[in-house]
A protein has these predicted regions:
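C-terminal alpha-helical cap of glycosyltransferases
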Residues: 342-359
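Acidic donor-binding loop of glycosyltransferase active sites
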Residues: 94-96, 240, 253-268, 275-276
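Active-site-proximal region of nucleotide-activated glycan assembly enzymes
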Residues: 31, 50, 113-174
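A short, well-ordered alpha-helix in the C-terminal region of glycosyltransferases
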Residues: 329-343
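Donor-nucleotide binding loops and adjacent catalytic segments primarily
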Residues: 43, 47, 173-260, 291-295, ...
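Conserved nucleotide-sugar phosphate-binding/catalytic loop shared by glycosyltransferases and other
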Residues: 2-7, 27-80, 309
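Conserved donor-binding/catalytic loop of nucleotide-activated donor transferases
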Residues: 115, 253-255, 271-280, 300
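Glycosyltransferases and closely related glycan-assembly transferases
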Residues: 22, 83-97, 104-120, 133-137
Length: 359
């Protein structure tokens, strides 16, 4: 049983682990547990994967009337969700429960620990999420994306890196050039703010476009689905605008630098691909964990961070141009990013899961 979701940062590690298990042991039953209100409610049925969706959503951490109302509704839904998880565990008798974080993983992890089912947690962020902080100590094992996670937990962890899709570091610059109709010989900036896009990033890059065009610098720009219609008219021969990019491996292969939010999974993919980055952490992420993720990359010399409060078109342009003009620095940052990458993380995690499951 693999439980996790709510956002792509928790769902896609679960899918990567599940795919690796299935590829290596096709007769193994992999069942996903998520939330009716998370991204997984769309993705799991689309992929035809065995799954159960729980009627729970995330805990709201503000004290607005709307948040209080949602939290009261959450409390009322927990008993039903708990019964559903218990029933699922009775019928499945899982050899191991894997939690990849997010509110969808909390109840399966709790039941697994309580019923003495081997239960492991995969934590993506430098600062561990609430579910990990609650259950790390009684869990069988914690597999962490970075060593920084140990600072915040009173238990031993295994630093494995984060599981990324196996194909992510096998992209082709030539294929990317053809796919996005851009010149593989030109410098290319890849800007994206996650699947939903980032309004501050989308806004800040617009005044920079003339300078990029004048210098022959290309921009591959994922706007987010909701922002695409308002921005698509800005496309030109050197600016390619997409609402959402599925072919991330080829996009990474084409890119010389990425301008992105600082979600753990994004940073793991950039590291595996050895791409220097300019990071804009989402300031309202829980416990400001994206800033902590970004700081890990900055300390290693793999990235430059601009806080959202400090973001302007001027300093974004200065940072992009400064890096692209400094080949030595760009190369060094790429090498440092690659040194952080753990392309075998998924394999290592699954090796450990098999050992736990087999006792």
């Amino acid at each position: 049983m693999i439980a996790g979701g709510g956002t792509g940062g928790h769902l896609y590690p679960a899918l990567a682990i599940g795919a690796e298990i299935t590829n290596r042991r096709p007769n193994t039953t992999v069942h996903y547990v998520g939330s009716k209100f998370g991204l997984e409610a769309r993705v799991l049925p689309e992929r035809g994967l065995s799954h159960t969706l729980l009627p729970i959503s995330g805990l709201q951490r503000s004290f607005s009337p709307r948040s209080i109302g949602r939290n009261l509704m959450l409390v009322s839904r927990v008993p039903l969700a708990l019964l559903k998880v218990r029933s699922l565990c009775r019928s499945m008798e899982p050899n191991v429960i894997v939690g990849t974080g997010g509110y969808a993983s909390a109840l399966p992890i709790k039941v697994g620990i309580g019923w003495k089912i081997p239960t492991v947690i995969q934590e993506q962020n430098s600062y561990p999420g609430l579910t990990t902080r609650l259950f790390a100590e009684p869990a069988t094992a914690v597999y962490a994306g970075t060593s920084d996670t140990s600072t915040y937990l009173d238990t031993d962890i295994d630093v494995t890196g984060n599981p990324v899709r196996s194909e992510i570091h096998n992209g082709s610059k030539t294929v990317g050039s053809e796919l996005f109709r851009l010149d593989s010989e030109r410098k290319t900036v890849f800007l994206f703010g996650g699947s939903q896009g980032s309004v501050p990033l989308n806004r800040a890059i617009q005044p920079v476009l003339p300078t990029l065009q004048d210098r022959g610098i290309q921009l591959l720009w994922q706007t987010g689905v909701n922002n695409y219609e308002a921005l698509k008219e800005l496309e030109s021969d050197t600016i390619r605008i997409k609402p959402y990019i599925k072919e991330m491996a080829h996009a990474y292969a084409l890119s010389d630098i990425a301008v992105v939010r600082a979600g753990a999974l994004t940073l793991s993919e950039l590291s595996v691909c050895g791409i220097p980055s300019i990071l804009l952490p989402f300031p309202r992420a829980t416990a400001d964990h994206q800033t902590k993720n970004a700081e890990t990359m900055v300390r290693a010399g793999a990235a430059i961070m601009i806080r959202q409060a400090d973001l302007t078109a001027s300093n974004l342009q200065e940072t992009i141009i400064g890096l692209l003009d400094d080949t030595d620095k760009l190369t060094a940052m790429g090498a440092q990013a690659l040194s952080l990458g753990k392309p075998k993380a998924t394999k290592e995690i699954v090796d450990k899961i098999f050992k736990v499951a087999l006792g």
